[in-house]
């Protein structure tokens, strides 16, 4: 009986895809064009740079203060998922605790300033809000969330024993060391950095295509502003134009775009998912943090700006 159900389900999916080939092709083209024109030129150089930095840091001792500085610089300036890469790296080296890593992930795995200015502000929000106000609306709520999360994390760590956390981190470190390439040969190291960066940027493109197709299918079969907003939150690149084109008040439209900017879209969440899970951090906590940041950005803009 199960085999029959699998056959019926497979046939239904294939038939559905054939009947909606135009929508799927349009979504695939849309996702690939955005990936090629906006993501690869901006993100790939920073992914390579992050790989070189982590390769260098692997051979030296890094203090906690230095680790925090590097996390904020890379996480806020290089674009996601580079923030996930560097946070997971310091967690595997046991420089930063699990609770602190979870608290920093939502804010320090963010869109790059270039994408924020060129795509979000210049192409869509310039007529509605100044860039200074945009920075305030996007980052201030995330800073507030991070401060609260870190405070709660510190309170929790004082009440509980750290032995379990250290054991978990040590296990992850051993696993990471066993899986890491031999850094003795610089050519092998740089080749691995390039291969890893190309792999990650390709995975990002695939996720962008998948969620662009899902958004197009959702808009095709469902109607209403609620459905349009939900489809926009699937992928930030295609979602911002969707929100921009909605026939709603300028205030709400701007707040939604800022909220999506802080959230990053489901596509961005899944781009970081594998890196988070390999490091034994919680993807659910990360998703919850991103959702809270998005909600805070929306409320902050609606109430104070």
Walk through the language-model features, giving the residues of each.
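N-terminal signal-anchor module of multipass membrane proteins
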Residues: 2-60, 197
């Amino acid at each position: 009986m199960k085999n029959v159900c699998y056959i019926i389900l497979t046939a239904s999916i294939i038939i559905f895809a054939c009947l909606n080939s135009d929508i799927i092709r349009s979504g695939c083209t849309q996702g690939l064009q955005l990936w090629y024109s906006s993501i690869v030129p901006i993100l790939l150089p920073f992914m390579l740079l992050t790989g070189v930095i982590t390769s260098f840091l692997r051979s030296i001792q890094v203090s906690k203060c230095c680790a925090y500085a590097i996390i904020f610089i890379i996480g806020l300036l290089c674009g996601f998922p580079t923030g996930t890469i560097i946070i997971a790296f310091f967690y595997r080296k046991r420089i930063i605790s699990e609770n602190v890593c979870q608290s920093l992930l939502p804010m320090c795995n963010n869109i790059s300033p270039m994408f924020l200015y060129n795509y979000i502000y210049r192409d869509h929000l310039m007529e509605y809000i100044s860039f200074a106000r945009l920075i305030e609306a996007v980052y201030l709520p995330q800073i507030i969330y991070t401060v609260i999360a870190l405070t709660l994390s510190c309170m929790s760590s004082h009440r509980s024993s750290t032995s379990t956390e250290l054991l978990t981190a040590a296990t992850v470190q051993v696993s990471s060391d066993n899986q890491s390439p031999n850094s003795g040969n610089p050519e092998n190291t740089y080749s691995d950095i390039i291969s890893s960066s190309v792999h990650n940027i390709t995975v990002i493109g695939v996720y962008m295509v998948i969620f662009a197709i899902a958004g197009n299918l959702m808009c095709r079969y469902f109607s209403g502003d609620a459905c349009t907003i939900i489809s926009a939150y699937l992928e930030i690149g295609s979602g911002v134009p969707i929100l921009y084109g909605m026939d709603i008040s300028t205030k709400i439209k701007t707040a939604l775009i800022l909220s999506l900017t802080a959230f990053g879209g489901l596509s961005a969440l899944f781009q970081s998912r594998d890196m988070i899970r390999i490091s034994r951090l919680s993807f659910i906590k990360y998703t919850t943090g991103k959702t809270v940041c998005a909600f805070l950005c929306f409320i902050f803009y609606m109430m104070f700006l």
